[in-house]
């Protein structure tokens, strides 16, 4: 590696060390490096070395061995020439860096626990202990707050009850009568269990008397309107027959006296009957209207037919 160089032989046979050769090649003949660094490049300097986190250790002292070996290499003529030793880099800064390396500040630490460690608890003694929560206070009647004013719902008045007109409702009376008859039939049916018989016998006399009196009063109230309605219908029928007979006799005389007046009055009577029926029925019933027209024609035009036939 460190053979004699022709330039050194001409200048006094001085032998050049490997360090000098490397220095010359690095200054003059070193090829241009690529900008991209490679992992295997020993001359590359990392970011950690630039920032100072990792000490930079140069391996210049490793070249001392080859330099000494090169200085003692024999020359071509058989003589051993002692060359000049290459200037070595001082080893003191390296030693200082190695000594200062343990004292550098560590930039990482062990992960701390997520929850802090609880302090040691004292040893509890046996016996009752006070609770952490206070006991509830006892409130007497005097401690209670006075009742406040009633809510708005209590001040509200109920809706007025609608007064329905007094109508004769046959359907309601019929349903009530059927329900009472069905109840009586069920009570009179044989084959009931002894439990129902015992329950009926064990009822108080007051309840039985009250129910019986209420039933009798209800029946009495039901009988009176029924009789009154029947008598009213019979009376209306008698009055209608008498009124129709009177009109028939009157139109008989009118047709004999003046037929024109009798015709006008007959039309008016028929219209009056139709209006009366509609007012009484309070419904638009075609059958009732036709019946009223037929009765009016019979009363007013019947005498004319008898006169024409006689």
UniProtKB/Swiss-Prot annotation:
The modification N-acetylthreonine is found at residue 2. It is a multi-pass membrane protein. It comes from the Bacteria. This is Uncharacterized protein Rv0497. GO terms for biological process: biological process involved in interaction with host. To M.leprae ML2433. Keywords: Acetylation, Cell membrane, Membrane, Transmembrane, Transmembrane helix. GO terms for cellular component: peptidoglycan-based cell wall; plasma membrane. Residues 198-209 have a biased composition (Low complexity). The chain crosses the membrane at residues 231-251, 257-277, 286-306. It comes from Mycobacterium tuberculosis (strain ATCC 25618 / H37Rv). Residues 56-66, 183-197 have a biased composition (Basic and acidic residues). Residues 22-163, 178-209 are annotated as: Disordered. It is found in: Cell membrane.
């Amino acid at each position: 590696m460190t053979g004699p160089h022709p330039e050194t032989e001409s200048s006094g046979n001085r032998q050049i060390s490997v360090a000098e050769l490397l220095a010359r090649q690095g200054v003059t003949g070193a090829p241009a490096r690529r900008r991209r660094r490679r992992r295997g490049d020993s001359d590359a300097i990392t970011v950690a070395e630039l920032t100072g986190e990792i000490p930079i250790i140069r391996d210049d002292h490793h070249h001392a061995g080859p330099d000494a070996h090169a200085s003692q290499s024999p020359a071509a003529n058989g003589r051993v020439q002692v060359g000049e030793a290459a200037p070595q880099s001082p080893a003191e800064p390296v030693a200082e860096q190695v000594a200062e390396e343990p004292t550098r500040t560590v930039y990482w630490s062990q992960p701390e626990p997520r929850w802090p460690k609880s302090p040691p608890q004292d040893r509890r003694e046996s016996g009752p202990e006070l609770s952490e929560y206070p006991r509830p206070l006892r409130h007497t009647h005097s401690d209670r707050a006075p009742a406040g004013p009633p809510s708005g719902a209590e001040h509200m008045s109920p809706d007025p009850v609608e007064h329905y007109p007094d109508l004769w409702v046959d359907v309601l009376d019929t349903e009530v009568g059927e329900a009472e008859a069905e109840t009586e039939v069920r009570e009179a049916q044989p084959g009931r269990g002894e439990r129902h018989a015992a329950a009926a016998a064990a009822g108080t006399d007051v309840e039985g008397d009250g129910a019986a009196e209420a039933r009798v009063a209800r029946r009495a109230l039901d009988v009176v309107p029924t009789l009154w309605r029947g008598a009213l219908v019979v009376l209306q029928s008698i009055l209608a027959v008498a009124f129709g007979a009177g009109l028939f006799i009157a139109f008989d005389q009118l047709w004999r006296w003046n037929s024109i007046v009798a015709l006008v009055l007959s039309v008016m009577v028929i219209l009056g009957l139709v209006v009366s029926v509609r007012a009484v029925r309070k419904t638009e019933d075609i059958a009732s209207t036709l019946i009223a027209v037929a009765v009016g024609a019979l009363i007013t035009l019947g005498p004319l037919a008898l006169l024409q036939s006689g």
